[in-house]
Amino acid sequence: MKLAIVGTHSTGKTTLISTLAKAFESQGKRVVIVPEMARLCPFPINEGTTAEAQKWILEKQISEENSFDDSEAVVICDRATIDNFAYFFRHCAQFKPEEDLAPWEALAVDHASTYDAIFKTQKLAIAAEADGDRAVGEVFRQEMDDIITRLLEKYSIPHILLPATTDYAAHVAFITEYLHGRDAVNRVSTNFS
């Protein structure tokens, strides 16, 4: 099973993923976490990102995800290709309108179908904390949240909106209940096939 947690930066995705991984591990499941590629990127990110950086992040995300071919593991991705593409889209719209985004957009959208479930965080009215990597400006965070939401809607990418809370235990319960319910539906539909 491959899950992705998406949303604008500084919405608790990484902490949620760590908490979720511990919950799965406590159930005896093997967990693999695909970290956020922007944190590993050798090029500028945030408001000062470049097309080169965003291409690197998108390609690296797909490569890392594809390197885990273990049907027994729960793979949890810190971001998905669609929210990585959102940062690329913003950069090109503002600074490089001549860039041909179509192949990159298609790649991000097509790859979205490889996730068994995508969960989107909500940007709450809580200031972002500086961590040395991500920008903390509210305008930029909101802009990215809006672009991610528009892309998910534009391409009808199935996703589940997480509750508007900073309670990670509530998020884990929500996700596990969703997955349990989905698995039950799949078992029933398989029995009728």
What is each PLM-predicted segment?
Residues 13:
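Conserved lysine of the Walker
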Residues 9:
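The conserved Walker
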Residues 36-38, 79-81, 120-125:
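Short loop/turn segments at strand-loop or loop-helix junctions that form parts
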